[in-house]
């Protein structure tokens, strides 16, 4: 009887030590590629907002050394004329964000692999020459990205930013 209990306990320990598919560590190689954004939200305290609206459109492309991001509000209207009015230009800046920078990856945490990108070109000077830190993990075919706290260029607020992506064709 004791041997059976010992065998069951040993099996349970081994089974618990083997990570499931969903818990496997994220690797840098998994990040490489172009990803289509599915959602983007920002949380400040207990307030959740959608800085580019609830119908965001855009892509993130990750190469072995560089991170590119371009998001726009999918519901924004085209300007009436090729030359933007001042009001249209201001509105356009509030409905998009784009930046790029070299990045490094660090340790795997419970939240995912840590990625730190140094912004060297951006649509907003508020984020130029800053570090953007994200934790990235996978849930099936989706890449989930979450920041501990970054400046949201469209609002200027410091928020926890989360976006969900799927591999682009």
Task: Place the predicted regions along the sequence by residue.
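Lipid interaction determinants
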Residues: 20-169
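Bacterial N-terminal signal peptides
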Residues: 7-16
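Positively charged n-region of N-terminal signal peptides that target proteins for export
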Residues: 1-4
């Amino acid at each position: 009887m004791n041997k059976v209990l010992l065998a069951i306990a040993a099996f349970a320990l081994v089974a618990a030590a083997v990570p499931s598919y969903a818990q496997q560590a994220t690797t840098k190689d998994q990040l490489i590629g172009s990803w289509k954004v599915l959602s983007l939200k920002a949380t400040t305290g207990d307030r959740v907002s959608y800085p580019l609206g609830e119908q965001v459109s855009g892509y993130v492309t990750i190469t072995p050394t560089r991170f590119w991001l371009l998001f726009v509000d999918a519901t924004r209207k085209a300007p009436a004329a090729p030359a933007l009015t001042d009001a249209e230009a201001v509105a356009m800046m509030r409905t998009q964000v784009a930046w790029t920078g070299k990045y490094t990856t660090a340790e795997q945490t419970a939240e995912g692999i840590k990625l730190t990108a140094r912004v060297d070109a951006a649509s907003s000077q508020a984020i130029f020459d800053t570090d953007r830190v994200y934790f990235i993990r996978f849930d099936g075919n989706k890449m989930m990205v979450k920041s501990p706290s970054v400046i949201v260029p469209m609002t200027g607020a410091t928020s926890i930013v989360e976006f969900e992506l799927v591999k682009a064709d």
